[in-house]
Amino acid sequence: MTFKPFLNPEDIAVIQTEEKNSDKKQKRTPEQIEAIYTFGNNVLVSASAGSGKTFVMVERILDKLLRGVPIDSLFISTFTVKAAGELKERLEKKINESLKSAESDDLKQFLTQQLVGIQTADIGTMDAFTQKIVNQYGYTLGISPIFRILQDKNEQDVIKNEVYADLFSDYMTGKNAASFIKLVKNFSGNRKDSKAFREMVYKVYAFSQSTDNPKRWMQTVFLKGAQTYTDFEAIPDQEVSSLLNVMQTTANQLRDLTDQEDYKQLTAKGVPTANYKKHLKIIENLVHWSQDFNLLYGKKGLANLARDITNVIPSGNDVTVAGVKYPIFKQLHNRIVGLKHLEVIFKYQGESLFLLELLQSFVLDFSEQYLQEKIQENAFEFSDIAHFAIQILEENHDIRQLYQDKYHEVMVDEYQDNNHTQERMLELLSNGHNRFMVGDIKQSIYRFRQADPQIFNDKYKAYQDNPSQGKLIILKENFRSQSEVLDSTNSVFTHLMDEEVGDILYDESHQLKAGSPRQQERHPNNKTQVLLLDTDEDDINDSDSQQYDISPAEAKLVAKEIIRLHKEENVPFQDITLLVSSRTRNDGILQTFDRYGIPLVTDGGEQNYLKSVEVMVMLDTLRSIDNPLNDYALVALLRSPMFGFNEDDLTRIAIQDVKMAFYHKVKLSYHKEGHHSDLITPELSSKIDHFMKTFQTWRDFAKWHSLYDLIWKIYNDRFYYDYVGALPKAEQRQANLYALALRANQFEKTGFKGLSRFIRMIDKVLENENDLADVEVALPQNAVNLMTIHKSKGLEFKYVFILNIDKKFSMVDITSPLILSRNQGIGIKYVADMRHELEEELLPAVKVSMETLPYQLNKRELRLATLSEQMRLLYVAMTRAEKKLYLVGKASQTKWADHYDLVSENNHLPLASRETFVTFQDWLLAVHETYKKQELFYDINFVSLEELTDHHIGMVNPSLPFNPDNKAENRQSEDIVRAISVLESVEQINQTYKAAIELPTVRTPSQVKKFYEPILDIEGVDVMETITKTSVDFKLPDFSTSKKQDPAALGSAVHELMQRIEMSSHVKMEDIQKALTEVNAETSVKAAIQIEKINYFFQETSLGKYIQEEVEHLHREAPFAMLKEDPESGEKFVVRGIIDGYLLLENRIILFDYKTDKFVNPLELKERYQGQMALYAEALKKSYEIEKIDKYLILLGGKQLEVVKMD
């Protein structure tokens, strides 16, 4: 059929005009239309929050389909599995709509094929796609397609720690042992263990894995900074410029401060005060030195400049005016602290290079050995799979070309959160001019997952400067939020975000515009509010001990406003969402809301599972079974509700012997052989007797049964599962216990067997201060939502409270002894021995930790990256609100009133100030004070503690009890009648559509055969319950050596072998033997494969020879999906499967399938698989529109190989 052609720019302009002049209620914007129809070049869509990027993606894909591009010719990468599912649902809906309006049967048939193809199309996460590549082509790297993913961090840690320990031991005894010990001590200090060094190794390893080629990065970039920045001349020019800018800013801020009305310039006698003279001198020097830097100092004089500044400015950060502290000098102190010691640093920095080379060697060895261990386990992390996929595409031109020819377009959503591994994959899949990228750099908030917003930014600038490289389209209309939210968001980020902090200039092209007239309607009551708890705490932002969780008073402040909204404005609780930076330490909110009757649900994912009481009891039970000599665990078990020993009981047992382990004391008490057996009362003796018998039963049971069975035996023997079901929050407690059994079962499925190893894994989790996610249970519907800002991304809520805006940003990484840069490599704090610097050797050693220049540069880069991400995080949080936005924190109204009044730089807060501020609140107050003469569209309101009493806050009305006398409300009998009527109607529908209700949505060919066995009239689709054997050969096996072979394992191994054989015009026995070595199966299974039969197939049978002759037309392990109709209900379902192989010729297809079933008569298997082969043939007919299909079974389970042609 003939499809519509793609549109040129003139055609797109016509559509834009028509849309503008249409009477549609909601019109597409010109930019949306351009993004949907632009064709023939790379396209980058910069889509601001709420601008309809998903709508654009779906419409563009649909347009491609309507122009004849099959769905399997599109590569569509999404950020999450959930996003992929939602995209598929929207596509299905749009295709169904197009089917209804399709005018030709050909188009209907084509769209129906695309509808079926959605589920098997390449729409999903990059992780899922790279797994698909490795499954199919991993054999080129010697990787088995039957691998598993190491998703559990705890399992990864077990393997990693074992590899690390072995390698560490090798280096400690190797030829560079002395230097290696020095390297370890550089990071571990005087600690006796090497845990700190191990964490640094893991940090470098994890960072390298985010690059597209970890080994190459380690070899070429890792030492780059250390080898480059060795003297003053190597200091980057931008670092010098930045320092001079900080000096200018400090001078300007100090000058503004001295001009304030409250600043005391003169004494009572009219003479300048000492402070005023000192400050004027500082201003004069800073301006002079910054303006004449090259003349006075130059790069070689940076250390002298830093020392001169130190001698002029005060040692503290603050200047106090009228009782208010202004941290004028903080940023300048931060910048010069390392510079003034550069001469000494350069002197010792060279010593660290050899240690870094040793670290480089260690990490490379660790990476290789860790990978080999994972290969041995046939289990890999997602990053391994991604790197395998890249290696396959880079090293195999034919495979790469196959994908580049296959994809009409390579599309990616959330492009701003791509990392370099994902970017390399997209480059390899694209032909260079068919990429479609959608994202928003202002919403890049996944740097902790190694996402790099500069990937987006580089494309943005390149396409902006040179349109021939690609088309840049900016979507700035917002269809989510009211003007009150949009205006406050714009006013904040116009003055905050630029390329230095935020990574992009928030100019008019990025400002949010209301996309519909409805949003432009003004509602004064919905003006954005910054609610601050008025507190007299001094130096809130400078307190290192600041609590990161929200204070009870702040929680009360939020509760008060929510109750007001609910009562006065009839806002349902479910319309309100609280956003927090972290999912931990929010207990204060939960307790406060519970106190005032506000229903609250969290987004899940809290990491408190192992700390729940019922799980702790079970873990101590398992620890005791594993090792009864663990006194802490055993006493906890005895004290638990399972056995109910009280303190008096335990004391009587304990004094039976002073020195023994507690378990031995219990045994002494059991046998009445202790030193004070007279203290064991009959009642206590009965308890001990019961415990010992039960406990020994569990220990015996553990030797021969799975962890899963052991845990359930404990639950049932002591009724513990039922017991917790009677406690408060019973549903959650029972779910936790049930999950413990499932997690134990999952653990053993990974190949790690045994109670000891499971306990060791759990203890490692706790030792590393990690935990497992809580188990989700049913939650109330009409409740306030509490979630992290990260979790809220992509969502929208009517009322949003951003909590704890006074929380300090986490700067832990900046204080690390090791900081990594993607472009400059490693920078470290080097511990130098400066003993010989002293004139007299007063001490045996003088150790000084110094920040090397690469470390200082990386530190500044990391600080700016951290602040930029926090700024984008605030943008994401503010743009979630539809109607009204609240930001909640705490500050002192009297002491902080003028604290943030700054001098504007190019309509932005000064860079030096933005770098100094470490909370959302700092930014908001500084913008408000610095630009108070402008309309900023948000108010700052202080709330005192006196306004947060129970009387002022109020209470949510409790539900009223049922009143039987109120006839108007007592409609019970009517409800029952109506309910019975509804149930009868439902039952009638169930019977009418029983077949459709029971019909599964997706089935495999084998399942189709079984499911339709009673109703399908297909020859051979009956389930064979018995096989009549013509002869019986009864032999007694030797049970000492014989092992029953698993038919399924043998079948899987044979199929993998046939897939791995390198096909050519002449397959030899050596090729089959080589392929067999690559098969991932037990040795016994491999030995059971009769490769002589396979060799016979290729050498002697007509089909085998023909396959070799037509190898260029051969397809192996081909997945398919096909739409079928249930004959009884008329409902449609999808059949999916994998075809072993077929030859796709010009006018016919030769289909073949391997079978390892045992047989005597080949006709048995021919009849058995008639229906399955018919389904395969039908799928191929629909895919290629070829009628003639020859079907063959290759039977390997008989005495000799048989090739059977099907009817």
From Swiss-Prot:
Example of a GO biological process term: double-strand break repair via homologous recombination
Domain UvrD-like helicase ATP-binding intervals: 26-482
Annotated CDD domains: DEXQc_UvrD
This protein's GO CC annotations: cytosol; DNA helicase complex
Cofactor list: Mg(2+)
Origin superkingdom: Bacteria
One MF annotation (Gene Ontology) recorded for this entry: ATP hydrolysis activity
Swiss-Prot/TrEMBL catalytic activity: Couples ATP hydrolysis with the unwinding of duplex DNA by translocating in the 3'-5' direction; ATP + H2O = ADP + phosphate + H(+)
InterPro entries for this protein: AddA, DNA_helicase_UvrD-like_C, DNA_helicase_UvrD/REP, P-loop_NTPase, PDDEXK-like_dom_sf, PDDEXK_AddAB-type, Restrct_endonuc-II-like, UvrD-like_ATP-bd
EC number: 3.1.-.-, 5.6.2.4
UvrD-like helicase C-terminal domain sequence ranges: 510-794
Binding residue positions for ATP: 47-54
PANTHER family reported in the protein's UniProt record: ATP-DEPENDENT HELICASE_NUCLEASE SUBUNIT A (PTHR11070:SF48), UVRD / RECB / PCRA DNA HELICASE FAMILY MEMBER (PTHR11070)
Entry protein name: ATP-dependent helicase/nuclease subunit A
Annotated source species: Streptococcus agalactiae serotype III (strain NEM316)
Phylogenetic placement of the source organism: Bacteria, Bacillati, Bacillota, Bacilli, Lactobacillales
Designated gene of the protein: addA
